[in-house]
Regions:
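C-terminal subdomain of the subtilisin-like protease fold in secreted/lumenal serine endopeptidases
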Residues: 12-15, 361-363, 440-441, 518-592
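Substrate-binding/access-modulating region of protease and related hydrolase catalytic domains
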Residues: 337-436, 489-505
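Subtilisin-like serine protease catalytic core
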Residues: 129, 241-346, 357, 371, ...
Length: 592
């Protein structure tokens, strides 16, 4: 063989050998992006769910529910979609995931609850007179409680040529698809439906999903360290106290994991903060477990809200509060669930399912303003607006939800963001849901670090009111409003996001830890402990009507040992996560 040919052969073999040492390109990870009820929602003998996933392999894939593999004959496949059908009496709510060759997808929560509503497609919406996007042919009927809801809804559907397509059965609420082509026809039919005997209200859905309760635009907050903001609520002090100071028998023992529902769309499991949840997770092993659909970006709203509770970060200062308690408490389950993109109606449907699945806490980082709402300066609020007719329907739906909650689940606490319109949070004509007066709704405002004052963390001037935060007597407590978004690069810190959306999960996390210590706490007792333990914010004592610098209901003498001369009396309340845990431990000795 000529020398040149021999050299080329040797070079070729060397290249092949080198290439063989490199692993084959890894397959894209499987990510579940959607899971919802489908088929006949009212079937009695079987229930079906439709699952959509990215990078679903062409070969066989295994589906697991509650840790057990689902039989192949219960699955149907169509491209990147799977349909799961189970006998009604065999369904148990729990985590669901896909596996292929030992690799797992993100776990999502499958609810056995029967509440499910449909979202409108792009060609099923229109602009109304207020220039707001509204559903054309999908509305929901709230049936009066002395009627059988489904039977009445079907009667009305037959009468009007409509079809029942969704439901929130515990609230006697049913979604109809109307035989209309435009808003004029819809409004005429809505008026007729609203006057029918047995119909309490008609809910019109406006715009898309509402969970972006955050400020818009980038500001100087990008330089604001997250840990400094959380220090204002003694975040790390609370973690240390829980792990080191609370006896093991008081934070674990025979107690069950605490289940928390977050009404959000999705979480990006490609972000390092959430990658650990792609591995098997058992809350009974004193772990925090996270279940959610997968998002496309790590800086989405759901990832930021869920991360405050459940992020796993190499820097302890960026660790989620509940995940920082791993190995010490009874375990926590954080369920990110949205039902569908059918706006406020879907928020309520998801909340009902989560409560029926055992959630003790609901995190509602969302809210809406009525058109015409003005802020504390008298300027119009221009975000998250809804028309008067839509607000009326939402108010009725939320009222039914809280009545049901008080009647059937009095131990559940809803924690809601006050809003970012710099408006009054408690005016029921202009703001929902924070304006509701019920012991089972805790409203959270936002504060930020006051860099102009060099004072101790306990001092009222350590923080100041976040300018955009909604205010007034209906706000129960405040917490840090700014957090850093997750990123795909573990060595890179994300942008700062601010809003009462991110103050809310700080309170939800504190309440979750409190309930893990004393599961017997009732919602009014939780509120009492949070306000008794609170640090303060704001000016001197002022019991006058809320003004621009009044953030929460003023601290009362009864919340300070009935001392009229206590310096905290009359000031606004600021979350103290450590002190709240201390008082919770004391509550075990002083059961009411």
């Amino acid at each position: 063989m000529p020398a040149r040919a021999c050299a080329l052969l040797t070079l070729g073999l060397g290249l092949l050998s080198a290439l063989a040492t490199f692993p084959a390109a890894a397959e894209d990870p499987i990510r579940i992006t959607q899971l919802k009820r489908c088929g006949d929602l009212f079937a009695e003998d079987s229930l079906s769910w439709c699952l959509s996933a990215k990078a679903l392999p062409r070969g066989e894939v295994q589906l697991y529910l509650n840790g057990e593999r689902v039989a192949a004959d219960e699955l149907q496949r169509d491209g990147e979609q799977l349909r799961l059908t189970l006998a009604a009496d065999a369904v148990r709510s729990g985590p669901l995931w896909l596996e292929r060759d030992g690799l797992r997808s993100n776990p999502v929560w499958l609810s056995a609850g029967r509440s499910q509503v449909l979202a409108a497609k792009p060609d099923e919406v229109a602009r109304n007179m207020d220039d707001l996007t509204t559903y054309v042919d999908l509305v929901s009927l709230i049936i009066e409680e002395d009627h059988k809801g489904l039977e009445k809804a079907r009667q009305l559907a037959e009468k009007y040529g409509a079809k029942v397509v969704g439901a929130i059965p515990p609230l006697n609420t049913y979604q109809l698809r109307l035989p209309v082509k435009d808003l004029t026809e819809r409004d005429a039919m809505v008026l007729r439906l609203g006057s029918e005997v047995g119909v309490d209200a008609v809910v019109i859905e406006e715009s898309a999903a509402e969970n972006d309760e955050q400020e818009t635009g980038k500001t100087a907050d990008q330089k604001r360290p997250q840990n400094r903001e959380w220090a204002a609520n003694r975040f790390l002090d609370a973690v240390d106290y829980y792990r080191e100071r609370i006896p093991a028998g008081q934070r674990a023992g025979e107690k069950q994991p605490v289940r928390i529902g977050i009404i959000e769309r999705a979480v990006d499991f490609d972000a390092p903060h959430f990658a650990e949840y792609l591995e098997p997770c058992d809350p009974q092993q004193q772990r925090t477990c996270l279940y959610a659909r997968d998002a496309d970006r790590p800086d989405n709203h759901g990832s930021s809200v869920a991360g405050i509770l459940a992020a796993h970060a190499s820097d302890a200062r960026d660790q989620g509060f509940l995940s920082a308690l791993d190995g010490t408490g009874p375990g926590f389950e954080v369920i990110v669930e949205r039902n569908s993109d059918a706006g406020i109606t879907a928020n309520v449907a998801a909340s009902v399912n989560l409560v029926e699945d055992g959630a003790r806490i609901l995190n509602w980082s969302w809210g809406i303003h009525r058109i015409g709402t003005v802020d504390v300066e008298g300027e119009p609020v221009d975000s998250l607006l809804r028309s008067g007719i839509a607000m009326s329907g939402y108010e009725e739906l939320l009222e039914e939800f809280f009545l049901w909650l008080r009647r059937e689940h009095p131990d559940v606490l809803v924690i809601n963001s006050a809003g970012n319109g710099s408006a009054h949070s408690g005016r029921d004509d202009y703001r929902l849901p924070s304006s509701f007066i019920t012991e089972q709704l805790l409203v959270v405002g936002g504060h930020e670090r006051n860099d102009q004052e060099k004072v101790a963390v306990e001092h009222p001037d350590y923080v100041r009111k976040r300018k955009s935060s909604n205010v007034d007597m209906r706000v129960d407590i405040t917490a840090a409003a700014c957090t850093r978004a997750a990123t795909l690069d573990p060595d890179k810190r994300g942008d700062v996001h601010c809003g009462t959306s991110y103050a809310t999960p700080l309170v939800a996390g504190a309440v979750g830890a409190m309930l893990s210590v004393n599961p017997g706490l009732e919602p009014d007792q939780v509120r009492e402990l949070l306000r008794r333990s609170a640090m303060t914010i704001g000016r001197d004592s002022d019991f006058e009507p809320a003004e621009a610098d009044d953030l929460t209901a003023p601290i009362l003498p009864s919340e300070r040992g009935y001392r009229l001369d206590d310096r905290d009396v009359g000031r606004s309340a600021r979350l103290d996560m450590r002190k709240a845990l201390e008082l919770t431990v004391e509550s075990l000795k002083n059961s009411r």
